[in-house]
């Protein structure tokens, strides 16, 4: 989301969970990795200058115990110049030999 774009959600969606083991979702973090890379590139505002650019890529996976009712969650990433909101939904087929077909 560009820094000039305002992102708003309903109050029900603004729940923030900081703990790695969340009892409310009955889930726990299984894997977490953050990769960072830096490089010098031409500045967007002045191509005659060189700007420092840093990129961050995050990977996370979690396991949930049944019964769980997590449909989708929203994860927010903040920086000084941007806010990224990612909608994440569980992969019901990950540990299953038979495909998951939602009903209803």
From Swiss-Prot:
Please list where the region (IV (linker domain)) is annotated.
10-18
Q: Which InterPro entries match?
A: Nxph (IPR010450), NXPH/NXPE (IPR026845)
Example GO CC term: the record gives: extracellular region
Q: Which UniProt keywords apply?
A: Secreted
Q: Give the domain of life.
A: Eukaryota
Explain the purpose of this protein: May be signaling molecules that resemble neuropeptides. Ligand for alpha-neurexins.
Protein name (record) = Neurexophilin-1
Q: Which gene encodes it?
A: NXPH1
